[in-house]
Amino acid sequence: MRAFLEEFKNFISRGNALDLAVGVVIGGAFGKIVTSFVADLFTPVLGLMIGGVNFQHLAWEIGGSPEDPVTINYGSFLQAVFDFVIIAFAIFLLVKAINTLQRKEEESPPTLPPPEVVLLTEIRDILNRHSQ
């Protein structure tokens, strides 16, 4: 059991597992923010723009009694689709920004050696020419 716990500790302390855990926590929080944005800001404004529609209450009655109808709540589904599109777009922008930064790092010109190294290289070359 001790070896198992030690192996688990080593797994958790590796960078990838920690990065994944942080990503999941931040992703969950970001998802809640986007859900609130869609439900509380985006769909009400969109509903007003297309004629005062409340997306949360859009549903088809497919059966049941008038007091307790069976419904397909497609308005909730539309909100989930809006959530997904906004989250996917935000992730796209984030990945695009990260790729741009990585490309700039790769394309940066090589740094010049310090003046001391240049001087020592010149001295070495002079000594090599004189020794021949």
Swiss-Prot record:
InterPro entries: MS_channel, MSC/AndL, MscL_channel. Its main location: membrane. It comes from the Bacteria. GO terms for molecular function: mechanosensitive monoatomic ion channel activity. GO terms for cellular component: plasma membrane. The chain crosses the membrane at residues 11-31, 75-95. It is a multi-pass membrane protein. Keywords: Cell inner membrane, Cell membrane, Ion channel, Ion transport, Membrane, Transmembrane, Transmembrane helix, Transport. Disulfide bonds: none annotated. It is found in: Cell inner membrane. Channel that opens in response to stretch forces in the membrane lipid bilayer. May participate in the regulation of osmotic pressure changes within the cell. HAMAP family: MscL (MF_00115). Homopentamer. This is Large-conductance mechanosensitive channel.
